[in-house]
């Protein structure tokens, strides 16, 4: 079996292994190894936990609901505690062509996913006995045309202390400022600790084996740039990490919500699960803030709730852009995504951008492709001599190996010359695979005709079938030294195997492979013409 076909088999096995491995990781992430401490019975970390002396009571009556809106999202805030209970992403449809905004945060009987925040500690206003009931005039607040930011303050007064919970919306940004301004006129110093947490129903990661997706927690700390912490991890071992910088998040396919506390103070990152109600929380607890009598203090934090936009997230917090997880192929995926985005900005079609990127990749690899076919042609010419050596030294494998290496050297043939282009294309393919799984820019991105979502599988399986046909043609047009009938049958079956395997892959990825095959066929014919002139190839079968 020639090297090219052998590596096609290896490529299929390798891709299958990577997909299965990632699916297993998403279903069963590795056990947490970073140093953690248990949350004790005396802790007042805010969550619905029996061991929590200052836990937030979930049974409290909801307050008034107000709406905040800028040009990219619409938020609903509960004035009881000031939690974000809904976020509608105005630039993203819930389903393809549905015209209904995608709702990321939501609170229903079937599913809870909300962003809670408050003040706990010695003089906290969010305790088991009750939460702050904020006051505000009006129900709807919208960023006006020409405005770059909008501040919406909620007011609460208690024991001579005025608390303002201020939400800051910015134009074109999914980054919501959540600040506290505290005016202490009580006559004595007070101490509070800020917290923010994401409360989510415990669910399993979704998707299929070909396109697995992760739903669960993640965090960043001063010791760990980025780490997933699944709901099963939370159920097995509650997280508790002290860090000066960092953030906590809940991830799902293409979207993320993340609390980013003040990065200049010490924070505790934690998780708490409520198995009875099937919910889990991942959050942070800030350092104690002391406000002397007659003084004011401002406590800052921010909440990202929106799509995984790498460039924007990188400016919000260190390592937040790592939630776009390209796996081990990130060093290839990032420049490929940049190139895709650049070309899409010119052609205004992601499908055309994929075709252009494929052309660029094949052009870069052309010298290696030419060397591959030249090496294969020389190897075919050497087949009679190699067969003669097998007959002469069949019992002396060491001598036969030495003679063959000598023959390769004399004829200036690299026996592995046919492998390199395929080996280089494999990580490129894997990088594109993760790009299509992770890049929200490709979600619901149309091509032409029946392909209206390049991030989803072809609904009619036309592209996988065309890809299989192109692979079959490429195989038939490539001379092979395979003489064993069994091996030949296996190779003839490979296009069908690949076609079946690609039925569930993103259509954009199948488009890449199809165009790559077509370009390879064209390059092959061009190379063969040159080889014919050198007497290294004949079109006669």
From Swiss-Prot:
Family membership: Belongs to the OXA1/ALB3/YidC family. Type 1 subfamily.
Subunit structure: Interacts with the Sec translocase complex via SecD. Specifically interacts with transmembrane segments of nascent integral membrane proteins during membrane integration.
PANTHER family associated with the record: CYTOCHROME C OXIDASE ASSEMBLY PROTEIN COX18, MITOCHONDRIAL, OXA1
UniProt keyword Protein transport, yes or no: yes
Keywords: Cell inner membrane, Cell membrane, Chaperone, Membrane, Protein transport, Transmembrane, Transmembrane helix, Transport
Localization in the cell: Cell inner membrane
Record organism: Haemophilus influenzae (strain ATCC 51907 / DSM 11121 / KW20 / Rd)
Membrane topology, as annotated: Multi-pass membrane protein
Stretches the record annotates as Disordered: 34-56
Protein name as it appears in the record: Membrane protein insertase YidC
């Amino acid at each position: 079996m020639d090297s090219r076909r052998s590596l096609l088999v290896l490529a299929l096995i390798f891709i299958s292994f990577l997909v299965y491995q990632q699916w297993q990781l998403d279903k069963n992430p590795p056990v947490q190894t970073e140093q953690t401490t248990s949350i004790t019975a005396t802790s007042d970390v805010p969550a619905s936990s029996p061991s929590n002396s200052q836990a937030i009571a979930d049974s409290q009556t909801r307050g008034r609901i107000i709406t905040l809106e800028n040009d990219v999202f619409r938020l609903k805030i509960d004035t009881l505690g000031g939690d974000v209970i809904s976020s509608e992403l105005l630039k993203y449809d819930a389903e393809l062509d549905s015209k209904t905004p995608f709702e990321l945060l939501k609170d229903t009987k079937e599913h809870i996913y909300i962003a809670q925040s408050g003040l706990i500690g010695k003089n906290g206003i969010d305790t088991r006995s009750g939460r702050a009931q904020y006051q505000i005039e009006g129900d709807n607040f919208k960023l006006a045309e020409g405005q770059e930011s909008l501040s919406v303050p909620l007011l609460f007064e208690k024991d001579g202390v005025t608390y303002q919970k201020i939400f800051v919306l910015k134009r074109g940004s999914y980054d919501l400022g959540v600040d506290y301004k505290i005016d202490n006129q009580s006559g004595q110093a007070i101490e509070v600790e800020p917290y923010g947490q994401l409360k989510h129903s415990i669910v399993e990661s979704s998707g299929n084996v070909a396109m697995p997706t992760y739903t669960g927690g993640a965090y960043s700390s001063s010791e760990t740039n980025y780490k997933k912490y699944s709901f099963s991890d939370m159920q097995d071992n509650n997280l508790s990490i002290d860090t000066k910088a960092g953030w906590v998040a809940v991830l799902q396919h293409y979207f993320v919500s993340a609390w980013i506390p003040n990065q200049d103070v010490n924070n505790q990152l934690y998780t708490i699960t409520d198995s009875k109600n099937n919910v889990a929380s991942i959050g942070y607890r800030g350092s104690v803030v002391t406000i002397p009598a007659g003084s004011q203090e401002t406590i800052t934090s921010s909440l990202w709730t929106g799509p995984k936009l790498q460039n924007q997230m990188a400016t919000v917090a260190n390592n937040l852009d790592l939630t776009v997880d390209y796996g081990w192929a990130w060093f290839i995926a990032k420049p490929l995504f940049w190139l895709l985005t650049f070309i899409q900005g010119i052609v205004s079609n992601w499908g055309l951008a994929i075709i252009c990127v494929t052309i660029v990749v094949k052009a870069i690899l052309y010298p290696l492709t030419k060397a591959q076919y030249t090496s294969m042609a020389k190897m075919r010419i050497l087949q009679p001599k190699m067969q003669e050596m097998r007959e002469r030294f069949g019992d002396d494998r060491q001598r036969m190996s030495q003679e063959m290496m000598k023959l390769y050297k004399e004829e200036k043939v690299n026996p592995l010359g046919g492998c390199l282009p395929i080996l280089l294309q494999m990580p490129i393919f894997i990088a594109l695979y993760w790009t299509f799984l992770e890049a929200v820019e490709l979600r619901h991105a149309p091509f032409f005709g029946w392909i209206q979502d390049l991030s989803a599988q072809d609904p009619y399986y036309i592209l996988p079938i065309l890809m299989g046909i192109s692979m079959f043609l490429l195989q038939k047009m490539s001379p092979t030294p395979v003489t064993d009938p069994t091996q030949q049958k296996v190779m003839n079956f490979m296009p069908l195997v690949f076609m079946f395997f690609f039925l569930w892959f993103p259509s954009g990825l199948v488009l890449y492979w199809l165009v790559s095959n077509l370009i390879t066929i064209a390059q092959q014919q061009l190379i063969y013409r040159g080889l014919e002139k050198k007497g290294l190839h004949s079109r006669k079968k």
